[in-house]
Amino acid sequence: MNDTLPTILVVDDEIDTCRNLQDILADLGYRVDVAHDGPSALELVRHKHYDVALLDYLMPGMDGLTLYREIKKLSAGTVAIVVTAYAGGTTTEEAQKAGAWQVLPKPVDFPKLMGLVDEALGQPLVLVVDDDPDLCANMWDLLRDRGYRVAVAHDEREATAQLANEALRVVLIDMKLPTGDGAKVYRLVRRVNPKARAVVITGHRSEMEEKVRQILAEGADAVCYKPFDVPNLLDTLARLSGERNGDGAEGAR
């Protein structure tokens, strides 16, 4: 089986719905796993990355929104599409607050759902490597609102586990991490996923000046300083996410 194929998780307590979605998505070339409840879905997510999760809103025990909040803790880059017989009104608002990308009514319009899956997979994937959970949460909200998929890592170990994802377009790397350092993570990016673009970030401009200069000389694409100039950060990400490495690096400040 081709491990580079997009992976989809379908979670619904209706067995026939799961079977139909699994058959359709598999025929389209996706790798598909199925779970019929929240705990089973979380067990799958603990051992495997999913690009998109299709989640039933109402299920016995853990509902789809509670499930997605837990999925985000394990796999922030997974995009959620919620399906429900109660679409609209407060359901849509609650889903958006939980971070779900789209809400679809049941019975499912399969062509529309397939279009949304394709659209979700086309969103550039950005990995934020920073030990500050509040910054990561804010970046997740900011970038998701602008159409990026956003994965998160808080240290070198967590980053290393995600760097091999071939969908990865840009990695934002904090220069100070609790284990390892940003320079080491940058070099891992170049070794493990050389097509990904790399932006170093730091709130310690003077202290990190020499290290930043060295990393830029090694080929990092840009540096952004904290507190972020948000328009500049977004412009940098927009430029880099549309490129693949090999087009020439530019240090943007």
Specify the residue positions occupied by each region the protein language model found.
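Acidic, metal-coordinating helix/loop segments flanking the phosphotransfer/catalytic sites
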Residues: V34-V52, K73, V152-V170
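Active-site residues of response regulator receiver
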Residues: D56, T84, D174
